Amino acid sequence: MSRQQNPLIQVKDLKKYYPVKTGIIPHVTDYVKAVDGVSFSIYEGEILGLVGESGCGKTTIGKLLTGLEKPTEGAILYRGMDILDWTAKEQKKYRTKIQMIFQDPYSSLNPRKHIYEILAAPMLYHGISDKQTVQKDVKELLEMVGMPQSALGRYPHEFSGGQRQRIGIARALSLKPEFIVCDEPVLS
């Protein structure tokens, strides 16, 4: 595979430290270094796997890449621009370009929403679909992940772990992202 000039995603000296608070009047006594000085680049069409023991920071890196967490230090560049310097409007647009398939599909799906609502809402909110096309688009997503259309009116608790994971995958694909972070997507 020939690499382009610029990476799609570039991570430079990324750090995420969580404070440890102790005492009756809690004060910071130390930090847990969940991510400490990580750097890598990912080019279009490339797949990168992070391998490591439990608790080594793989999920935290995914959350940092998607903007769900803010780093303590470092830079995350998307097409050469640091996402940490962006306005809220620019970050909203970025979140349509990068999606995450979560390790636990049950906790990532709203238990009060039907599957149709879970899949349709992001497409409508971000302008991927409109009211005329959203139903067709949702059905296509279900077909892509091997789920029957009868799933649309059901709630997440009515599915097996594997089926919920496929719904989570469909939701990640719903925004037609350029980049997907998969946090142990075949665990369930």
Please give the residue ranges for each predicted region.
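Conserved ABC transporter NBD signature motif
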Residues: 74-82
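The feature captures the beta-strand-to-loop junction immediately N-terminal to the Walker
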Residues: 51-52
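Conserved ABC ATPase signature
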Residues: 155-159, 163
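Conserved catalytic motifs of ABC-family nucleotide-binding domains
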Residues: 176
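Conserved ABC ATPase "signature" region
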Residues: 133-150
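Helix-to-loop junction immediately C-terminal to a conserved catalytic motif
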Residues: 66
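Hydrophobic anchor residue at the start of the ABC signature
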Residues: 169
